[in-house]
C-alpha cells in the first residue's frame, strides 16, 4: 500500500474512501457551501475541498460512478481525468448532465471514483516504419459489432 498525503482545504471535506474491501476506486465527495444544479447538457466543476500529494511515478484518475451514470446520466466529460504527481491544487471534478432532467449535487454527495496507479514514462524511438500485424491500420469499428462466436 502506498501513502498519499492529503490536505483538507475545508474542514467539512470528506476524505476519499473505499466502499468495499476489494474496490479499485475510492469514492470522492462534493464539498459545497450550497447545492449545485446541473441543467440538462450542462457541466460544472465540483470542488472536493481536498489537495493531494502523490508519490513520484504515480497518478490519480477520476472516473464516473456507475450508479450516477446509469440512473441520472451524470458523467465526467474528461474521463478518466488525470491528477499528476506534481499537482498541488484543489481536486475538482467536472460533472456533465447527459440526462433530460436537472440534477442537483449536494454537499457530501459521492460524485466520482479515484484510482491511484503507477505510471511509467516512455521514450519515443523515431523509426521509418512499424512492424506488420494482422490488424494493420484497421480501427474505429473495423471488427464490427456482432459477436464472432455465432
UniProtKB/Swiss-Prot annotation:
Positions binding substrate in this chain are 65-67, 78, 82-84
The UniProt annotation puts the region (Disordered) at: 130-150
Q: Which UniProt keywords apply?
A: Hydrolase, Magnesium, Metal-binding, Nucleotide metabolism
CDD domains named in the record: trimeric_dUTPase (cd07557)
What is this enzyme's class at the first EC digit?
Answer: hydrolase
Question: What single Pfam family name could you report for this chain, choosing any that match?
Answer: dUTPase
**Listed cofactors:** Mg(2+)
Catalysed reactions listed for this entry: dUTP + H2O = dUMP + diphosphate + H(+)
What Enzyme Commission number(s) does the record list for this chain? 3.6.1.23
Classification via Gene3D superfamilies: 2.70.40.10
SUPFAM superfamilies, sorted: dUTPase-like
BP-aspect Gene Ontology terms: dUMP biosynthetic process; dUTP catabolic process
Q: Which family does it belong to?
A: Belongs to the dUTPase family.
List the NCBIfam families hit by this protein, alphabetically: dut, PRK00601.1
What's the protein name? Answer: Deoxyuridine 5'-triphosphate nucleotidohydrolase
Organism name: Chlorobaculum parvum (strain DSM 263 / NCIMB 8327)
Organism classification: Bacteria, Pseudomonadati, Chlorobiota, Chlorobiia, Chlorobiales
